[in-house]
């Protein structure tokens, strides 16, 4: 009896992470509206503030290299959307932020350091050079230079993150741009 109980308990302990991942992915439903800046994000984040960090295929993030990991406002991973043809992480479900830089710094902290942000402040405001350990200025390839590109609700932002005024339901995303 004891050996059977111990074997069952060990099996349960070994399978718990796999079952948790399966249940998390099965219960997370994503917005499917190509006209919405929330397309591909969890449905519970619709009309909430979200930040997404997308890493280049050539420079995948160590932790977020398979699809886009969704992290809620409490730092809990909700699941991974593998249908976005991108890799990275989105942190969302927020309300009430009005300053883009404050939102970015507060939301990325919830990834437990995996999305740490490095920036310099110059005459034009905050310049983001590193996200999640990837310093755009150190990238090499078939291009002259690289930078972290900011999008606001699916369009290139006309202002930097320090001057970005947030509204409810805004989606901010970062990806590597080159010239």
Positions of PLM-derived features:
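Ubiquitin-like/PB1-type beta-grasp interaction modules and other compact soluble beta-rich domains
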Residues: 2-179
